[in-house]
Amino acid sequence: MAQSTYVPDRVGVVGLGLMGGSFAKAEHEGGREVYAWNRTHATVELAEIETIDGELTDDVIPTCELIILAGYPQVSIDWLQRMAGLISPGAIVIDAVGVKRVICEKCFAIAEGHDWTFVGCHPMAGTQYSGFAHSRANMFHGAPMVVVPPKMDDFDRASVLERLKHLLEPCGFGSFTLATAAFHDEQIAYTSQLAHVVSNAYVKSPAAQSHKGFSAGSYKDLTRVARLNAPMWRELFLDNADNLSREIGTLIGNLQQYKDAIDARDGQRLEALLAEGDRLKKEAERR
């Protein structure tokens, strides 16, 4: 391996939206030097006031031990492709994208020609809001971090993961879970993407416009993520279209059973369906 050029613990963040801004603020509060790049330069200037030490320029990239790709999937891939030759040997590059197959396949391939390591990551945290203004330093406190490591021997993998945990220590993640990109995308289609589709579709009922005075916790819970960043979620949904389409189909089939029982006024069948859902929820919580 060539001589490293990075400054220990220095962090570069690519994309200062909700996730990137939260990474930058957490690392800054943890005493780390943080540099950032964003497509909208005004956001970088805003972050320079109290969050970052400067812009992530071509001269700064080789000095970062950790680089976090926190933009949309294709933006992150394109940035890494352009800047791969500037990254220090021995540095670690991670992403924060909500799908893993597409980004890991391309970023692992980019990394193969260099002496730095790419590790796929997905912080399991967020809000229904987007943008740097809504980012916060405690966004990841106690949250799980899903990690998709590259193919390497057990010793090298353990070494990279220990370094990664150290570099992300200011973020306060509650756990680090190893997964393959394929398994991650299967699970996330159900636990996150389907929830956003359902919430977004649910508020399209005409009744939503007159809900005030008739809604409480269940309405609030189900509609929270109906408010979303449409361009970002479009890209995430289409990058995981096979898994998400399957989950939507499963849900449609399940809903049809409830509708059929209600249309038939079949109380016995309806009660059985409700009891089954209650039982499966309890089983899932015990795992």
Over which residues does each language-model region extend?
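NAD(P)+-binding Rossmann beta1-loop-alpha1 motif at the extreme N-terminus of oxidoreductases
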Residues: 2-62
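N-terminal Rossmann-like NAD(P) cofactor-binding module of classical short-chain dehydrogenase/reductase
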Residues: 67-68, 94
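Glycine-rich, N-terminal phosphate-binding loop of Rossmann-like dinucleotide-binding domains
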Residues: 70-72, 97, 149
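Internal alpha-helical scaffold of NAD(P)-dependent oxidoreductase catalytic cores
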Residues: 137-224
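Interdomain hinge/lid region at the active-site interface
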Residues: 210-280
